[in-house]
Structures are given as structure tokens and as C-alpha cells.
């Protein structure tokens, strides 16, 4: 369990091998980590009777990472008024710009 308990049952899935965050993990190690995530998440959901769950991996300080060892947060959700706030601000799409960004990512 995460000692901060953003919501009751807030759990961390942590690999034994050290990686700063998911961005440093090789595919095999990431696959091993994420093979466990649904199994543990299902148990947390069953045990807590939560209505939903956020599954979060913060990568680097600007994204909220404060512990620099890879870990995945499983945050049970009970209502929209709990202590976890994640806001995605929708923007009017510029499809030309989206195509440019997609092409840049594809070629990276």
C-alpha cells in the first residue's frame, strides 16, 4: 500500500529491479510489471468495493514523480469528490497540427 493513501486501498506495484521510471524500462521488464497490474488491481477493486480505479505511472518531476524508482499507482475511486484530482482540459482540435505531431512521433 502507498503510505499516502490518496484514497483507501491506494496500492503501489513496484518492480524489484531498479529503473528511474517506465521510460527507462526495457520491453521485457515492463511486460513483467504490467502483467501484474490487472491482477493486483482486480484484487484491490474486490477488497475495497471501489466504483472505479485510476492506474497511474508518473514519469519525471514535471509529471508528478517524487520517488525515482519505477512504480505504478492503483488508486481506487469511490466518487468524483475524493482526494484524487486529474483534470484533462479539452481543446478544439487543429487536425493539421495533430497530423504534424503524429508524424513527428512516428519518425522519432
Regions found by a protein language model. Give the residues of each.
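HIT superfamily nucleotide-processing domains
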Residues: 1-108
Amino acid at each position: 500500500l502507498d503510505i499516502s493513501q490518496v484514497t483507501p486501498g491506494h496500492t503501489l506495484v513496484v518492480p524489484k529491479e531498479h529503473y528511474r521510471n517506465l521510460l527507462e524500462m526495457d520491453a521485457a521488464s515492463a511486460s513483467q510489471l504490467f502483467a501484474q497490474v490487472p491482477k493486483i488491481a482486480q484484487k484491490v477493486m474486490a477488497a475495497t468495493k471501489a466504483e472505479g480505479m485510476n492506474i497511474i505511472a508518473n514519469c519525471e518531476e514535471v509529471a508528478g514523480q517524487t520517488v525515482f524508482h519505477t512504480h505504478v499507482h492503483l488508486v481506487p475511486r469511490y466518487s468524483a469528490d475524493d482526494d484524487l484530482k486529474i483534470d484533462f482540459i479539452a481543446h478544439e482540435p487543429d487536425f493539421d497540427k495533430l497530423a504534424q505531431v503524429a508524424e513527428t512521433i512516428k519518425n522519432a
